[in-house]
Amino acid sequence: MQVSVETTQGLGRRVTITIAADSIETAVKSELVNVAKKVRIDGFRKGKVPMNVVAQRYGASVRQDVLGELMSRNFIDAIIKEKINPAGAPNYVPGEYKQGEDFTYSVEFEVYPEVELKGLETIEVEKPVVEVTDADVDGMLDTLRKQQANWKDKDGAVDAEDRVTIDFSGSVDGEEFEGGKASDFVLAMGQGRMIPGFEEGIKGHKAGEEFTIDVTFPEEYHAENLKGKAAKFVINLKKVEERELPELTEEFIKRFGVEDGSVAGLRAEVRKNMERELNGAVRNRVKSQAIDGLVKANEIDVPAALIDSEIDVLRRQAAQRFGGNQQQALELPRELFEEQAKRRVVVGLLLGEVIRTHELKADDERVKGLIEEMASAYEDPSEVVQFYGSNKELMDNMRNVALEEQAVEAVLAKAKVSEKATSFNELMNQQA
């Protein structure tokens, strides 16, 4: 076997391989012997068919199969010998084959980039320092009560957290536009569902009033014909409602799994959940900054084959989220996923190099801790832990999570890490 390697462009490589004629003939004869042992041909007993008959009937197909097998096997031998690491599926380009002569073919593919980590000392990470205060717990209890609240009619003016039922009709330059009209539209104030100025224009009015508000559509609005346009909305305010918050009764508290039904028990449970969310948010914030810094400090070429593969993964995930099938996933435009796919490939390559250079392996205690932390959010944590322990795929996924955390910690060990005091709400809003 003769081998030559050339760079086509960037990460592209072409390996040209020549297989000696006698190697091909030896392999063909060997395979024909195997075929002769198995085939049945009228007039001959099984295994007693003359080789010339077998060769005449099966020689062409056997030769083709043997060539395919030799091309694959010799390519693998070549890249092992040349210490080449292909990324993605190779493209075989066979040359002209003539029986009795050497056979030359080429294989085109991309290789993984050579990654040499640098600039880790320049990465800056700001670690949030947060504690869950009594006021934070009070705020979460208020949120829980609001989620369970009943709505009752209100005689007064619309306030920031009320709910209104309205008819509205919008126009630009005196002309109504598509989607600008609705009847009996229920709007919970303060959730940012409408364009800027819409809710503000309703506040202070009472049920039964009809009025006009002036707003301007944002420049980034999805409808091209409305971007940046001034509009008028005629509003008929039909109903105003306010929340009627439930009291923290024993019955109410038990809905949240607090068996003794006490306020103290509920506060303890809420605090525990908030601290779990907080720990995850701090980890994610630090990890995000570390990875951003790692990517910024290390520009690398990315094999197109890996990006294409990642785009397919993102397409399937998107289709699953929206109830689509495999075919619909493939029809989604690649432009929707290309940037995210490239980012994921780059991050994977860089963290992979961190893992390799630091000889990291998933720490069993960390894996156990991650599973227990995740399971604590469920009603029966021990059942969840047991389920993970009996599922190889889930355990492998959790080991990958642990290994990624360890890689991020290796980056942080060399980065410039500072601390910044912040509040629970500020941090959680950054995560949203």
Swiss-Prot record:
Catalytic activity annotation: [protein]-peptidylproline (omega=180) = [protein]-peptidylproline (omega=0)
Keywords: Cell cycle, Cell division, Chaperone, Cytoplasm, Isomerase, Rotamase
One term under GO cellular component: cytoplasm
EC number in record: 5.2.1.8
PPIase FKBP-type domain ranges (all copies): 161-246
GO molecular function, one term: protein folding chaperone
Domain of life of the native organism: Bacteria
Record-linked InterPro entries: PPIase_dom_sf, PPIase_FKBP_dom, Trig_fac, Trigger_fac_C, Trigger_fac_C_sf, Trigger_fac_ribosome-bd_bac, Trigger_fac_ribosome-bd_sf, Trigger_fact/SurA_dom_sf
The keyword Coiled coil is assigned to this record: no
GO biological process: 'de novo' cotranslational protein folding; cell division; chaperone-mediated protein folding; protein transport; protein unfolding
Compartmental location: Cytoplasm
Similarity annotation: Belongs to the FKBP-type PPIase family. Tig subfamily.
Family annotation (HAMAP family): Trigger_factor_Tig
Free-text comment about domains: Consists of 3 domains; the N-terminus binds the ribosome, the middle domain has PPIase activity, while the C-terminus has intrinsic chaperone activity on its own.
NCBIfam families: tig
PANTHER family the record matches: TRIGGER FACTOR CHAPERONE AND PEPTIDYL-PROLYL CIS/TRANS ISOMERASE (PTHR30560), TRIGGER FACTOR-LIKE PROTEIN TIG, CHLOROPLASTIC (PTHR30560:SF3)
Function: Involved in protein export. Acts as a chaperone by maintaining the newly synthesized protein in an open conformation. Functions as a peptidyl-prolyl cis-trans isomerase.
Protein name per the record: Trigger factor
Source organism of the structure: Enterobacter sp. (strain 638)
Protein's gene: tig
